[in-house]
Each structure stands twice: as C-alpha cells, then as structure tokens.
Amino acid sequence: MFKLRVLVLVFFSVFSLGAVFPPMSGTAIEKYIQKKLKHNDKILRINEKNLGDAGLAVLAQSPSVRSVTTLVLYKVHISDEGIRALAESPNLKNLEALYLEHNFITDKGVEIIASSETFSNLKILNLYHNGITDEGAKAIANSDTLTQLIELNLNYNQIKGPGAIELTHSEKLRQLHNIQLAYNPIEKTGKQAWKRFQLMESFKDLHRNNRLNQVGQALIGSFGVMVLLDFPFVSELETLDLRNNDLTDEAVIALSQSEKLKSLVS
C-alpha cells in the first residue's frame, strides 16, 4: 500500500508540475531542427523541449536556420545567456518574428535583444511570461535596432509603470501598433498611458478604413472622449454617436467647447 501511494504521488507530481527532461544533445537538436523545417523552412517552432542556453547556442550556429523568418521558442528553459547566443548568430538575419514565451529572460536579455543588429528586421517580439521589469521595457522603447516592430507582447511580466509609459511614448518605435501588457502590476499612470495608446491605435485603424464616424460604437467612455479630442483627424468627424458611453460632465463640456468638431452634422 505504501509503495502504491508513493507511485501515485510521483505520477501526480510529474503531470501536475511538469517533468523536466535531460537537456537535448547538440546532435539531437540539429536533427530536430532539420525535421521541423522539412515542410516549411521559414518557420521553426520548438515547444516544451529542454533546449537550455547551450542548446540555443547550437541552434544559433546551425546553418539550417538561415531561411527562418519566424522562430518560436516556447518553454525551452532558456535565459539571458541563450539570448546572447541568438544575438551573436550569423544565421538569423532574416528573422521577422521572435516568440520567447514562458522562459527565464530578464532585463539583461532584453537589453541584448534591443541592441543586436540580428534583430533589426523584427516585426513581432513576444516575451510573454518572463522576468522583465520596467528597465527591460525602457530598453525596447529606446532601441535604435527594433525600429521595425509592429507588435510587442509583454504580458505576464513585472512592469509597474515607467516602462509602460516609455513604450507608449517611444519616438524610436514608430511602427509599433500593438502593445500587450496584461497581467503586469502596472500602476495607474502606466495603465492610463497604455489605455491611451490602445485608443489612439483604434482611432487610427478606423480612420485608415474610412470608418471614423463609427468611433462612438466602441463605448470609449469619458477617458476615450478626451483622447479622441487629441486625435489628429478628429476634425474630420461628421457624426458622433456616444449613446451608452456614460460620459462625465467634464467630457460633455470638453465636447461642447471643442473647436475641432465644427464639421459635425449629428
């Protein structure tokens, strides 16, 4: 009975906490890469393998990855040293999307990414669930290398506010339209900066698609109204339906006194 109980506990631990398998050997990694790229040499996905930093160094030096434009490394037990190996790779110059979800990357690793020419063509950077703080976010915001970024995912990290503010006001990341910061301990000013950024991007999207007159349907609220009045193309509005937005007196007064809404018909 005692042995059975021990076996049950071991079984439960392995499947509830996740088994940690031995690191993959260099030969095994190379074979795995070739297998994964056999049908599509542009996308390399490695999920829940014990690659480790040493294994990532093997990947980075493999000629097989020269064609890769999308690299996904999910739960592969890598840290900042692994990121350094990627950054120094002569074979990853074509990377456009880098997914590093659920690993052990800190601000140091982010600083390496933000300063490496290897990542100068990145359009998507996903750092979901790592150990990144405001300093890492600031490194991205001030990067002279990541200027092509369109989408940035920093969900489930440790960003508290200053990093969020710098990201949403970055003068370097002119192409960045999507910033994900959910499940970070962000303080009020940081949350407001992020919300403002999201609203501005939604307004830009409506304007690009000639649907700016539908802006009120998004239930933007009083804060959204104040942001809308700062939108460069707000003067093009012809109709503005803000029913069900539960506006404050401040927002209503701002709307009524705005010189930018002279084109409104209804």
Regions found by a protein language model. Name each.
Residues K49, V76, N103, L127-N130, ...:
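Consensus "Asn ladder" position of solenoid repeat domains
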Residues T70, A85, P90, E96-A97, ...:
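A detector of tandem-repeat and repeat-rich interaction/domain scaffolds
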Residues E117-Y183, E187:
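A charged, solvent-exposed segment within the mature domains of Sec-exported extracytoplasmic proteins
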Residues H39, P63-R66, P90-K93, E117-S120, ...:
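Inter-repeat linker/turn residues at the boundaries of leucine-rich repeats
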Residues S25-Q34, G52-Q61, S79-E88, D107-S115, ...:
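Leucine-rich repeat
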Residues L44-I46, T69-L73, L95-L100, L122-L127, ...:
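Conserved hydrophobic beta-strand positions in leucine-rich repeat
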Residues R5-F15:
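Sec-dependent N-terminal signal peptides
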Residues F21-A87, E101, R208-T239, D246:
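LRR N-terminal entry segment and analogous cap-like coil->beta motifs
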